[in-house]
Amino acid sequence: MKTLVIVEHDNNSIKGGTYNTITAASKLSGEITLLIAGSAIDSVISEAQSIDGISNILKCDNKIYSNFIAEDLSALIANNIGEFTHILAPSTTFGKNLMPRVSAKLDTQQISDIIAVESDDTFKRPIYAGSLSLIHI
């Protein structure tokens, strides 16, 4: 199993939600690879290199990704999926804008707003406005 984590950042530093996403990814078996797309992202790469448990970092440094347009990023991800079995992104405006597009391009179902990773194929998420939790198997 290989997991791809989409890094949310501001072209200078990694945003906090990404660290939560990496923690969730660490509950899955296999390698964790980070995808960092943006413009002039050397400081983001340096910060990412200090994170424990990361096997690889994919860097895409191009002005087209400087504004984090979901249409551009989703094409990048979908066209370079390789052997990844899981793709994770922070449950932020960034991730909620990006991941449905990636899911559609890959013709697969997205599982949104997970609160726990139980195993490689079981995820816990809240339903009914958070008054009930559901486990997808």
Describe every region a protein language model picked out.
Residues 1-135:
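N-terminal glycine-rich FAD/FM-binding segment characteristic of electron-transfer flavoproteins
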